[in-house]
């Protein structure tokens, strides 16, 4: 590569780096962006906060959801229960004792299903994930509608146990024009999901859920629920080596729907920890929606991944537009091959490290471009003339070998004849 070209290439790299770094500041995608990404951007990593910011607020609380969004969550997973008078509230357990106390600080040993909404609103949520050791807070149990109104335009809720209350949830979302504000996780058979969705005039956004280790069952489940119209499939197993996590299994979902994994539950993540090391692992397997307890860290990891993807995409554009006319055949072919690999990486769900490594390899291929006049002296170009010359040389070697072999055989025959004549003369 000439000095001028090298300078232009270095300038292009600097521009790419500066522009990409401008997008590093953490922010949560808008609900519209998240829904669009679910449907149209299969490689974009989506961060789902499990029950909100439980490090600072009660799980399933409006305040915890809002805090998770501020920390970069694209979606927030919640669970719902129905009260005695039919209101849907955010709560993981039917029994209130783990998460609720009365005004005196006493745990409430009652179920949601036997308690009315007005009575529930008198109770207070315990901090974090609740339990005996957690203290009471000032925060209250919200209804699903209150939560939707509070986060309107800020995030998308993923209702984990939606199948249990699917009809009530659908009616509430439909009546309040909120079908695009929630994703319903349907843990049911493929036939049941297909049957339920087929009767809907307006289609909700749906994830299905499969837990198991048998590969043909998981692949069949993916295919059938994809055909039913789901936007994602949560694949889970307690076995780290389950074929459920195999790239070939996840590939059944890629390009059609999102592969979802819950890193907060060892029985669903194959006992993988909710850390960057294992985020690398699952994203390299094709998972692109991750449910996490570490919202801020995963959000930063997601931004790093998208930044690396943007940088590689921009460098691919530079490589595609590079004039190779005066470049050596060897270096030009090397760049073309590397560019093909880079585009394959961009079209797949891969980890941040893979994107960054591929950026380095493509940069190296670009920087290694050499002018034909200087490089072809060392890297011999394969041409028709050279191929013909090589063939003629090979034929020449074969002919020489044949002549030599004939000469050797004739010499052997003459020696044998000479020995016979010598023997006869000696006898006389």
Walk through the language-model features, giving the residues of each.
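Bacterial N-terminal signal peptides
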Residues: 11-23
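Cytoplasmic C-terminal tails of single-pass
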Residues: 409-428
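Hydrophobic H-region at the start of alpha-helical membrane spans
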Residues: 12, 386-396
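Bacterial N-terminal signal peptides that target proteins for export
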Residues: 1-12
